[in-house]
Amino acid sequence: MQKARVVAAGVACLVFAIGGSMSSTMAQQKKLKVHISVDMEGVGGVVTGEQLGPTGFEYGRFREFMTREALAAIEAAKAAGATEILVADSHGNGQNLLIDQLPADVRVIRSWPRRLGMVAGIDDNVDAAIFIGYHAGTNNPTGVRAHTFSSANLTRVALNGVNVTEGSWNAAIAGHYNVPIVMMSGDDAAIAEVRKAIGNIEAAETKRSLGFHSANSLTPAASAQEIGRKVRAALGRVSEFKPYKVQSPVTVDVTFKHYMPAEVLAYLPIFERTDSHSIRFRAKDMAEASMIMNFIGEYRPDITP
């Protein structure tokens, strides 16, 4: 009898150990870190500069709508199993989201300059990336507020000879860290461009472009609902998405609206002036290319402090 009890106790311990190990493994498998990059031009209802910056008469309201769309993505990601969420405020001055309306367990990256730009904070610990409020690239004739990085200064950005949008550029940075883009929101033109570049990701169409400054848009409530639905769908099949990879080293071509930036940058040996308004540079990978583009966009001799 005593021997039987010893055997039974041993079996029980073994079962407990196996069960604990399985529980630990399952817990590790359930970890899901999500990065959400939030721009504003692709937010439902946005059509002109009046919604996009502090001087616009509708900016205050549209900060709320932008935050609502980000929150819809966050809540849906949590419902789909996300255990860690990092949000990058990636429009204008990088200080648009009403962060007091976001959950306490979310981290938020704000303002500039910052490494990796619109996808700052992404690394190889992230499992999936989401783009909210994205817009079409500067060479697109139909997208609402279409531009690439700077509507005031740039007319073209190309990566390995192919014109890029902010979406495809940021997808390539994420791909450098083996992070797939699983979902995006924006107008129909923006979605079509990104899908053409990186594949058939989940997408929430917040509006249909009628021109640079006009759109047939969903309401803020409907946009948020559609974003939530598509985020849940994307994370429900997250293993099906693959990182967007570009060949390294990378070659980047940048064309400016004015000739002086190209002339002055060409003084630096890393830049080659390819025509009156354009420069070219090469980088070992997308992380380095991102840093150089950040320098091009952010450096001013009168920067303070």
Where do the model's predicted regions map?
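Mature N-terminal segment immediately following signal peptide/propeptide cleavage
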Residues: Q28-G49
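Active-site glycine-rich loop that binds ribose-phosphate moieties when present
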Residues: S151-Y177, G186-A189
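C-terminal accessory domains and tails appended to enzymatic cores
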Residues: I85, S223-P305
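Short catalytic helix/loop segments, enriched in acidic residues and glycine
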Residues: L52-A72
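Bacterial N-terminal signal peptides
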Residues: A9-S21
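Sec/Tat signal peptide C-region and signal peptidase I cleavage site
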Residues: S21-A27
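Active-site rim beta-loop-alpha module in soluble metabolic enzymes
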Residues: I173-I181, S185-L235
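A glycine-rich helix N-cap at a beta->alpha junction
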Residues: A104-I122
